Regions:
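Core segments of cupin and vicinal oxygen chelate
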Residues: 2-3, 9-52, 86, 92-102
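Short, charged/polar, Gly/Pro-enriched secondary-structure boundary elements
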Residues: 44-48, 56-57, 113-115
Length: 120
């Protein structure tokens, strides 16, 4: 089997808010259709957001319902944190040690999907 394209797709009740959040965080743009938005970075499709009016966000860290999450590796955690928060992310779990050589912080996007900003 040859996979031609691999895309992460998030369910969200508000397509515009969710796709704008991810486009802002990834430095991309949104291409909008009626019930689907695509997020492109440098013209390349990075992820999709599909309309799910009854979307229920996971109850992190319990994971009910269990959902995928993204690990986004960054060079500057402080700058990435500030950008994520300014776009509407919520910090769910701060890093145990910001001075450690590697680590992560857990956030939720506007629809409640967890993601991590990682370093090291």
């Amino acid at each position: 089997m040859k996979i031609k394209r691999q895309i992460v797709v998030f369910d969200a009740p508000d397509l515009a808010a969710e796709s704008t959040f991810w486009a802002g965080l990834l430095g991309g743009t949104v291409v909008a259709d009626d019930d689907w938005h695509s997020v492109l970075v440098d013209g390349v499709w990075q992820l999709g957001v599909q309309l799910a009016p009854n979307h229920v966000p996971p109850d992190w860290p319990d994971g009910t319902p269990q959902q995928i999450h993204l690990d986004l590796h960054v060079d500057d955690l402080k700058a990435a944190h500030e950008e994520a928060i300014s776009l509407g992310a919520r910090l769910l779990k701060p890093a145990d040690d910001l001075e450690a050589a590697e680590g992560f912080q857990v956030y939720a996007d506007l629809a409640g999907h967890p993601f991590c900003l990682c370093w090291g």
